[in-house]
Amino acid sequence: MIGRLHGTVAERHPPALLLDVGGVGYELEAPMSTFYALPAGDQAVTLWTHLAVRDDGQALYGFASRAERDLFRVLIRISGVGPKLALALLSGMNAEGLQRCIEREDVATLTRLPGVGRKTAQRLIVELRDRLDGLLPAASGGVPARTGSGEQLDAPAGPQGSREDAVSALVALGYKPAEAGRLVNAVPGANDLPSEELIRRALQAAVR
């Protein structure tokens, strides 16, 4: 079982990334919360991992903290919530936001996330109500999400095609292509933003 990897990010195509560990490239899928925490350059990072065995092969998932990885594991144990939906949940809102939705039984906000219907939202509330305690404090050893000043690390410069990359990422997280395009196009200044910032703002708008 692979529990943690330390290396440099060679490629990033949300929600997928390639982590170079001693010359070996590991393909991982990660929630957008992890992408936001990654440094822009070639600084070494540590990702907590979960290995899933599927009928068509294996998939490795990476997370910025152990707490985030543990929350992912709690989510995929809920009936009807697979890894793809769990990634969408952790991409659409952070752990604290998810906890608030559960505590307030906020079905309306949960159903704005891709793949979450009313029944799934209600199941999440019932199943998670007593399971989130102790999961939210961030574990040490993962990639730093913020600088010492409290400001978010700079995102990598956005290449041409950031809009297309953002739409592709939202589709991979479960949004329909038309909805993904609408969310991205609605972001002010979309043409000037790097893809990960564009994804972040589109997801924020989706759950408002």
Swiss-Prot record:
Residues 1-64 are annotated as: Domain I. The RuvA-RuvB-RuvC complex processes Holliday junction (HJ) DNA during genetic recombination and DNA repair, while the RuvA-RuvB complex plays an important role in the rescue of blocked DNA replication forks via replication fork reversal (RFR). RuvA specifically binds to HJ cruciform DNA, conferring on it an open structure. The RuvB hexamer acts as an ATP-dependent pump, pulling dsDNA into and through the RuvAB complex. HJ branch migration allows RuvC to scan DNA until it finds its consensus sequence, where it cleaves and resolves the cruciform DNA. InterPro entries: DNA_helicase_Holl-junc_RuvA_I, Hlx-hairpin-Hlx_DNA-bd_motif, NA-bd_OB-fold, RuvA, RuvA_2-like, RuvA_C, RuvA_C_sf. GO terms for cellular component: cytoplasm; Holliday junction helicase complex; Holliday junction resolvase complex. NCBIfam families: ruvA. Keywords: Cytoplasm, DNA damage, DNA recombination, DNA repair, DNA-binding. It comes from the Bacteria. Residues 158-208 are annotated as: Domain III. Residues 144-157 are annotated as: Flexible linker. This is Holliday junction branch migration complex subunit RuvA. Homotetramer. Forms an RuvA(8)-RuvB(12)-Holliday junction (HJ) complex. HJ DNA is sandwiched between 2 RuvA tetramers; dsDNA enters through RuvA and exits via RuvB. An RuvB hexamer assembles on each DNA strand where it exits the tetramer. Each RuvB hexamer is contacted by two RuvA subunits (via domain III) on 2 adjacent RuvB subunits; this complex drives branch migration. In the full resolvosome a probable DNA-RuvA(4)-RuvB(12)-RuvC(2) complex forms which resolves the HJ. One of its GO terms (biological process) is DNA recombination. It is found in: Cytoplasm. Residues 65-143 are annotated as: Domain II. It comes from Alkalilimnicola ehrlichii (strain ATCC BAA-1101 / DSM 17681 / MLHE-1).
